[in-house]
């Protein structure tokens, strides 16, 4: 199956190459085909493009129909001959004259009528409900217009040739009307394709009227009826007339039926295949867009250009992506307010009040002389300074897999080991504290901050009420880190840690710290042995 491609697949590839209308292509055009232009294209250029395309499609479809009709009346049913058995003024005068007149007048009138129905889009304004209705009716009106011109031609030629020989009546009645139905069906499909940009603009104003949107099934059955059902009925009528008139030999009748059957089969297949191809295009566009969303491209948005269930599919995709964007925005805001780790934990588990005992390391950071800082600078400068200060804190805490639990004025409380567990939270906390102290000296020499590090058992969880709570940690290490931060403000390096936290760290991290004397911290009964880092950058003079 993979080695041999079907005829339909080969034809599909040809059309995809010509029109680039395929979801397999890396850059799927907004309207499904580059022939229809870009969404940002000016209305004037779009009008010219669509008018030229419609005229070309209408003329081409009619020329093909005329060629098939000529084939049917001359070769499929050769007797009586329209050349030998009819006057020359009719075959070489009236017929070509009407064909040229109808082709020129019909192409101009139908194209102009379609452009008039799209006047609202050309003027760049929102359509009224009636204008929206006329826009969606445009393909049907083009098809009906072709049926009228071909119907007049059928009546005229059948009458004129029938006056000469009544054997011409069934031939022209069937052949011309048969081709007219095929041409009308083809122009309907082509017009619907060409008007996609305007249909998209109309759909932005609201869904199409329900009676103009029969759906995929209704549209498919109508095309089948006009492209295959009616021609088959015509074949049956031709056979019935032949049974009555008996003006063909058995071989001539068989040849005629075979030719007409082949024409019906081929053109019916082509029409149904084009319909299926046009129907599949929006699905392919959605599929390509889904792949982009899977890659995380949530800015993906589709142009809704179909008035059937396929348009609902495109609209539903846009609603889905809008919901995903909103969800991602809320997730981002949630993570910024409570911390990425807390937000991720809240998504994984059902949030509830209470907590659990955890072994964590705590880093408390507070700016030295914050009161003087606030009174000596304009408020805007203070906010800018604080944002730069906290940016350093957040950057280093995130880099060491910690959590900035809260900002308290010009201070911050960071946790290592909750809510996400760490193999050795002391290592991460001590390394982050050293990095913050070093960066503050180098990047913000005008702003000094005391840093305290402690470790131990705490209760970590959601504290508050059911309507409003926040994730935090409660325990002795938090108080100890705050007291060490106060003490560090008056010490060289502005960074102190408890010996207990340093002792619990890895050998590599312990080598970066030196133990000092015991100090009784405010609010503590037992003295705490201090530790300070070695090799920190000294403050600039």
UniProtKB/Swiss-Prot annotation:
Q: Where in the cell is it found?
A: Cell membrane
Which parts of the sequence belong to the HAMP domain? 278-329
**What are the GO BP annotations of this UniProt entry?**
cAMP biosynthetic process; intracellular signal transduction
Q: Which GO terms describe its molecular function?
A: adenylate cyclase activity
Instruction: Give the Guanylate cyclase domain ranges.
Output: 361-485
Cellular component terms per the entry's GO annotation:
cytosol; plasma membrane
Entry-linked PROSITE patterns: GUANYLATE_CYCLASE_2 (PS50125), HAMP (PS50885)
Arranged from A to Z, the UniProt key words for this protein are: Cell membrane, Membrane, Transmembrane, Transmembrane helix
Q: Which InterPro entries match?
A: A/G_cyclase (IPR001054), Adenylyl/Guanylyl_Cyclase_3/4 (IPR050697), HAMP_dom (IPR003660), Nucleotide_cyclase (IPR029787)
Q: Where are the transmembrane segments?
A: 57-77, 90-110, 144-164, 167-187, 221-241, 257-277
Q: How does it sit in the membrane?
A: Multi-pass membrane protein
Protein family (similarity comment)? Belongs to the adenylyl cyclase class-3 family.
Q: What is this protein called?
A: Uncharacterized protein Rv1318c
